[in-house]
Amino acid sequence: MSQHTQGRLAGKVLLVTGAGCVGPGWGNGRAVAVRFAEEGAKVFAVDKSAEAMEETLARVRAIPGAQIESHTCDVTQASEVKGMIDACVARFGRVDILVNNVGGSARGGPVDLTEEAWDKQIDFNLKSVFLACKYVLPLMEAQGGGAIVNTASTSGIRWTGAAQVGYASAKAAVIQFSRVVAVEYAKKNIRVNTVIPGQMHTPMVEARLAGQRAGGNVDALLAQRQARIPLGFMGDGRDTANAALFLASDEARFITGAELIVDGGMSVRCD
């Protein structure tokens, strides 16, 4: 990753969910773990799969002086999420920054999508954010403050080329959830913001989305996605991570209840 001024998060503890990837490369959670570690944060990396976090751990441990601990958790289960927060405190003593990054889509409109698939989409993309905030907010309040960055998607604000009503609804709800919590906890020195990635080139695109939307043809899917972006190229997890870093840092001390769209201009097109 590119070189930046070091130490913007020195002494801070980051808890990031969805810190693994389905393959090599820069997923959002992996990039957040690495980028925040580069800036001095101690990283508590969480994913449902320990194997998915192996590259994340290796990349962070390659940074001189970096500290990282991994933890497996099903973030749709309240008891496991509470245990996740407790484990982070046991290891690092506190949680200064929470980045909720778990997410995944399922194709289908209200007729095609099964009720079971709908429930899973809401649990995975929205309930996970609710539970993590539910258990971290009292801790941050007791600590005297903190910063939360929730990851939504341009699917939550625009049509992005495919019917995925469960995913889009959940991500739209994440945006409004963040606004409500931001106002409620502003006087407690807890900032809550949302980063909204667009159609990024991440490991999940190649491993899963190509099969859902382009008959397994990765190049065709990448071409479709890139054609929608005014800047003419797709970003990756590092772009999402840099946006989250700004929102989590003291540089954003006067920003709460806001959304930062990272999509190369895609969402402002009208064609």
Each model region followed by its residue ranges:
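Canonical Rossmann dinucleotide-binding motif of NAD(H)/NADP(H)-dependent dehydrogenases/reductases
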Residues: 6-44
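Active-site helix of classical SDR
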Residues: 133, 170, 178
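Short, small/polar-rich loop/turn modules that mediate ligand/substrate recognition or access, typified
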Residues: 186, 191, 255-257
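A conserved structural motif in NAD(P)-dependent oxidoreductases
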Residues: 229-240
